[in-house]
């Protein structure tokens, strides 16, 4: 399983400031920064084997995905967030997926547990649930 970062903004933000058509245009926008990462002011995109590095800035930084999502929902700026936190807002139109033609970072996910001769039933149930949830979440994004 893996998740990838998605660039998004609210329709209200896009109406007021316009929609960036290329990653380079993000330099002129209000971006919501993820302080969880070092180098948060540089967003990376890939297209046709070319790496694009964009310096961004904005009014707000947080290491909490839900705060960044809420800031994007109220029109404070453009956010880059993990796909798994955005599927319902993208599906119902409260956020719009930007720069879809450009690839962003993809992160694998692992479930790590100790091995002592077998996986406890409760751990297996949790693993099955998470695998199914992330699979369905990815399928929902593919339909957008």
Model-inferred region functions:
Residues 2-32, 48:
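Flexible hinge/capping segments at coil-to-helix
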Residues 9-11, 81-84:
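Beta->alpha turn/N-cap motifs
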Residues 24, 69-70, 124:
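Alpha-helical segments flanking ligand/cofactor-binding loops in enzyme cores
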Residues 25, 42-55, 89:
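Ligand-binding cleft/hinge of the Venus flytrap
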Residues 33, 53-64:
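Short beta-strand-to-loop elements that line the ligand-binding cleft
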Residues 67-69, 86:
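Short, hydrophobic alpha-helical packing/hinge segments within bilobed ligand-binding/sensory domains
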């Amino acid at each position: 399983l893996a998740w990838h970062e998605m660039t998004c903004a609210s329709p209200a933000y896009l109406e007021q400031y316009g929609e960036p058509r290329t990653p380079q245009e993000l330099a002129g926008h209000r971006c919501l920064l993820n302080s969880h990462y070092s180098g948060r002011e540089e967003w990376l995109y890939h297209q046709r084997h070319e790496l694009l590095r964009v310096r961004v800035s904005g009014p707000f930084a947080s290491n909490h995905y839900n705060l960044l999502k809420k800031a994007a929902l109220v029109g404070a700026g453009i956010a880059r967030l993990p796909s798994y936190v955005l599927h319902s807002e993208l599906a119902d139109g409260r956020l719009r997926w930007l720069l879809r033609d450009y690839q962003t970072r993809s992160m694998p996910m692992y479930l790590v547990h100790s091995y002592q001769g077998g996986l406890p039933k409760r751990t297996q149930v949790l693993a099955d649930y998470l695998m199914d949830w992330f699979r369905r979440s990815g399928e929902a994004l593919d339909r957008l």
